[in-house]
Amino acid sequence: MQTLAQNLTSQGVDASLTQLIHTLANTSKEISHAVRHGALAGVLGATEQENVQGETQKKLDVITNDMLKDALKADNTVRGLASEEEDYIVEVGDKGEYLVCFDPLDGSSNIDINSLVGTIFSVLPAPTGELTESSFLQAGRKQVAAGYVLYGPSTMLALTTGKGVQLFTLNPETNEYLLTTEAMSISKDTGEFAINMSNQRFWEAPMQTYISDLLLGTIGPREKAFNMRWIAAMVGDVHRVLSRGGIFTYPTDNKNPQKPYKLRLMYEANPMSFLVEQAGGIASTGYEAIMDIEPSEIHQRVAVILGSANEVKACLEYHSLDYSEEPAL
């Protein structure tokens, strides 16, 4: 099996990006160690702080954020970073080539129940000149690398540099990432969907109708049985989609009219969309490709629909219909 280093060399990834990927991968090993120790290390539970999203921070949110921030600040390829747990961008150096956006511990609410969590990251080119928030506001198409690390029964790294998606598994004996899937590919068709059904009454009409039709199974217009899956961590749900197909969505809702979207564009939706598209899937808001969005701010949120190409297309057809007229009585 190829090591991560050998694989990056064989793909012709340049030296500076290779260095940055190793920084992220090596830090993920430290995070994996912290996650595994859990209650034994006293890192479970919440802090008394909230992040910029207004979410209560878990102890491991803060710990993993500091791990990544410290590692990236020591990497001379990095110009700046943005994190879910940081209110503002962090300037690292004036000569780095890359900007890094990350969610240090996606699904952290799962930590206290010993369920799946992960790290998501996006790498963008650093523009010249003064570093400001606008330096980060680049469409997802500009990403030069993206990936996630899943901390589960085994620790796995999914990575793309624009040449497909490679999956690596951390060997616990050698502490090396080894290539276990050379090219992840999402099946075009699926019988699985992932959505938080507790929000059903708050969704827009297109998603209400789409999910209702899936639930009707063989007696509905889709004439096919579907199973629902929900891990409550984007990293886990997207990993399942990459591994065996499916559609994952966190759609627009009016539960809180001031926050119609849940997932963050820069360090959740964009990197996951890059991976999904590189594996042959589609990633959309319902109305436009996620990676075509021109960001307006670093913590911007968006609706997300991604996964198996034919099923995402079917969902998008519902979003193209006119729901403005009341049905005739």
Swiss-Prot record:
It catalyses: beta-D-fructose 1,6-bisphosphate + H2O = beta-D-fructose 6-phosphate + phosphate. Keywords: Carbohydrate metabolism, Cytoplasm, Hydrolase, Magnesium, Metal-binding. Mg(2+) 2 binds at D103, D106, E268. SUPFAM superfamilies: Carbohydrate phosphatase. Its EC number is 3.1.3.11. It holds the Pfam family FBPase_C. GO terms for cellular component: cytosol. InterPro entries: FBPase_C_dom (IPR044015), FBPase_class-1 (IPR000146), FBPase_N (IPR033391), FBPtase (IPR028343). It comes from the Bacteria. GO terms for molecular function: fructose 1,6-bisphosphate 1-phosphatase activity; magnesium ion binding. Its main location: cytoplasm. GO terms for biological process: fructose 1,6-bisphosphate metabolic process; fructose 6-phosphate metabolic process; fructose metabolic process; gluconeogenesis; sucrose biosynthetic process. Mg(2+) 1 binds at E84, D103, L105. Binds 2 magnesium ions per subunit. Substrate binds at D106, G107, S108, S109, N196, K262. Pathway: Carbohydrate biosynthesis; gluconeogenesis. Its cofactor is Mg(2+). It is found in: Cytoplasm. Belongs to the FBPase class 1 family. Homotetramer. This is Fructose-1,6-bisphosphatase class 1. It comes from Shewanella woodyi (strain ATCC 51908 / MS32). The lineage of its organism: Bacteria, Pseudomonadati, Pseudomonadota, Gammaproteobacteria, Alteromonadales.
